[in-house]
A protein has these predicted regions:
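Short, solvent-exposed loop/beta-turn-alpha elements that line the ligand-binding surface or hinge
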Residues: 12, 73-91, 160-167, 222-246, ...
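Active-site-adjacent bridging/hinge elements
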Residues: 1, 68-77, 101-108, 162-174, ...
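Conserved oxyanion/phosphate-binding beta-strand-loop segments in alpha/beta enzyme cores
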Residues: 51-72
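Ligand-binding "clamshell"
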Residues: 141-162
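Alpha-to-beta junction loops
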Residues: 125-137
């Protein structure tokens, strides 16, 4: 959410559905960018190539709006009787769609939702007040952040009527290394992967560019190998490091390939107070800001709600295809 817009209009960050509607309406009708024109978007929506709700991280989707009704389209959910039900056709999804339709009818959601070719365009043009996305959305708004043009802050919103924040969880992985039954030495794949992970940080320290590192010649079996809680660990370490509670000697970098460089950068980029991650509390003019600030903002702003607040995770009960899906879809 554009914190600078909230501040300029004297609004608090929304938590409930009704509060979200109030803020979105203010962003549309009260000229939060101060240009005297009726040209702002309350809530950004997906483009014509994206999804309103998806499995996993869905930037610009409306997933939290569905989840606030405990609706999970495209997910298989275990019902009260133990059977597995498809989330797209549950009553909660109908309820969510009705409320989302109201937002759209009242022009609180992007009028060009699902028609616009690129949802990023109005976002980078400074015309959007709210969008939904994963923690790494800090990279998406990097240009506006580096220019000091927009203070984006992350929130869990909207909460469900019971006061909880529900969120669907992504699949554990979507990338695989596969050895066929004809492979004579399948253990070689494990050895290669272990070697790559073990040496990644050393190569970075030696000056190997990330562009070179992802080529197949340099990095066979390239994949994303990381701890499931990598970002939460990074948030915890960085905030404690800024607070003076730990030093680099207290951190094991062997399985955290970017954490050392993050710690080195954050002390140069963060202004006091060290627990305030507002836009004006960063050294935007630093010569290392361009290469480091987007990631630090993604972690310390984008992942803050996941670390500081409780949420109810909802998992997909079935990740395969049914016979009907195979023949009809």
């Amino acid at each position: 959410i554009r914190q600078d817009w909230l501040d300029s209009l004297g609004l608090e960050a929304p938590r409930t559905w009704d509060e979200l509607v109030k803020v979105a309406e203010a962003f549309v009708t009260q000229d939060p960018d101060g240009n005297g024109e009726d040209d702002t978007i309350g809530i950004l929506g997906p483009s014509n190539s994206d999804h309103m709700n998806a499995i996993g991280g869905n930037q610009y989707g409306l997933d939290p709006l569905f989840s606030s009704f405990q609706s999970y389209p495209q997910y298989w959910l275990q019902g009260e009787d133990g059977t597995v039900e498809y989330g797209s056709i549950q009553p909660e999804t109908r309820d969510a769609l009705e409320k989302i339709s109201e937002l759209y009818t009242n022009k609180l959601i992007d009028p060009e939702m699902l028609v616009r070719s690129d949802s990023k365009e109005p976002l980078l043009a400074g015309k959007v007040g709210i969008f939904f996305g994963p923690w790494w959305s800090g990279y998406t708004v990097a240009d506006a952040t580096l220019a000091g043009a927009a203070d984006w802050q992350a929130y869990f919103t909207p909460l469900s009527e019971d006061g909880n924040y529900y969120t669907h969880m992504a699949e554990p992985t979507t990338q695989y290394v596969v050895a066929s039954k004809a492979c004579k030495n399948p253990e070689a794949a494990f050895k290669i992967v272990n070697y790559l992970i073990e040496n990644q940080q050393k190569w970075v320290d030696e000056g190997v560019s990330t562009t070179e590192m992802v080529t197949s010649d340099f990095y066979p079996l390239y994949n994303t190998y990381d701890n499931a809680d990598e970002i939460e660990v990074s948030y915890d370490v960085l905030t404690k490091y800024l607070a003076g509670e730990i030093t680099m000697d207290d951190v094991d970098f062997s399985t955290h390939k970017l954490l050392k460089s993050d710690m080195e950068a954050v002390t140069k980029l963060k202004k006091e107070p060290y627990d305030d991650f507002s836009l004006d509390k960063w050294n935007l003019d630093s010569d290392i800001a361009k290469n480091n600030l987007p990631r630090l903002v993604a972690i310390l702003v984008g992942d803050a709600p996941s670390v500081k607040e409780k949420y109810v995770p909802v998992y997909n009960a079935y990740n395969g295809q049914t016979e009907t899906m195979e023949t009809k879809w």
